[in-house]
Amino acid sequence: MRIAVDGMGGDHSPSAVVEGCVQALEEFKDIEIYITGPEDLLKEAFSKFKYDKERVIFIDAKEVISTNEHPAMAVKKKKDSSLVKALRLVKDNQCEAVISAGSTGAFLTGCTLIVGRIKGVERPALAPVMPGKNGPFMIIDAGANVDSKPSYLVQFAKMGEVYFKSVMDVNNPKVGLVNIGEEEEKGNDLTKATYKLLKEEKDINFIGNVEPREVSTGDVDVLVCDGFVGNTVLKMYEGVASTILSMIKSEVKSSFLAKLGVPFLAPALMNLKKKMDYKEYGGAPFLGVKGICVKAHGSSDAKAFKNAIRQARKFHENDLIGKLSEEITKKSFDNQKKF
């Protein structure tokens, strides 16, 4: 499998990106890395490690898109940027996947404009998978579409369902709609209209509205919402997780008795920390585009980046894009038959 990597994306690039690539090359013998960025800088970063040089291809790119630039303008103007060149590799079928920890806006815009949407997809969506009490769950959309239509959300539900079936091996994923109450009539015009449409979808296992307090504790696989709500929920969830872990650490240090109990609690606490660590999940797939596009966290370290590569590899193994294309095409055909 050939994976394009934006070597200059993220807060700790290129060092963390390069180290993550080296770790992935060591663990996965069937991948090749096409890394974009200033070639001399990248080669210098790689020189600090031992790696299979035959499986790393350097693509020279002189420009970098920063997080404070206008996404669409930057993608269109900076043709020689590390991000655009990485996306072009997927567009031109030189790579099967692309990963970046850079500007989220530029990445999502570039994926849509350069890689292109799957035929029939109204709007691609960012779909991070998060740790929950009863197992991982997906938030879709988590920020790509701040303003959405009911038909978009129905398609998000379908894409999330396909993901859980093909990647997570869940036969009948439960789909919920994020709302301020469980009752059907609760919410705004968007959620009310979406609820009615989802209820009519016989091939989606729609369980109804899910309140924010049940996001991590409820028995649901796919949480559907517009990008504004999804991004808010995602960042709140990350913040709460970080705060809880910090509070536990402070309490343990606060008394002698608490410190005595650490050896007994350490395994459980370490397991909890691992479950709530975004680094374990690597990145969020951008579903609805023609290639495997994974957005890594901006503050990704080497471990997070390696896991983002692991994710991309798993998506490829499970033919996620092919299954999404098949399902969306089938759905579009079924809708045409109604008229």
UniProtKB/Swiss-Prot annotation:
It catalyses: a fatty acyl-[ACP] + phosphate = an acyl phosphate + holo-[ACP]. It comes from the Bacteria. One of its GO terms (biological process) is phospholipid biosynthetic process. Its main location: cytoplasm. InterPro entries: FA_synthesis (IPR003664), Phospholipid_synth_PlsX-like (IPR012281). Gene3D superfamilies: Isopropylmalate Dehydrogenase. GO terms for molecular function: phosphate:acyl-[acyl carrier protein] acyltransferase activity. Pathway: Lipid metabolism; phospholipid metabolism. The keyword Acetylation does not apply. Keywords: Cytoplasm, Lipid biosynthesis, Lipid metabolism, Phospholipid biosynthesis, Phospholipid metabolism, Transferase. GO terms for cellular component: cytoplasm. Its EC number is 2.3.1.274. It is found in: Cytoplasm. Catalyzes the reversible formation of acyl-phosphate (acyl-PO(4)) from acyl-[acyl-carrier-protein] (acyl-ACP). This enzyme utilizes acyl-ACP as fatty acyl donor, but not acyl-CoA. Belongs to the PlsX family. HAMAP family: PlsX. This is Phosphate acyltransferase. It comes from Clostridium perfringens (strain SM101 / Type A).
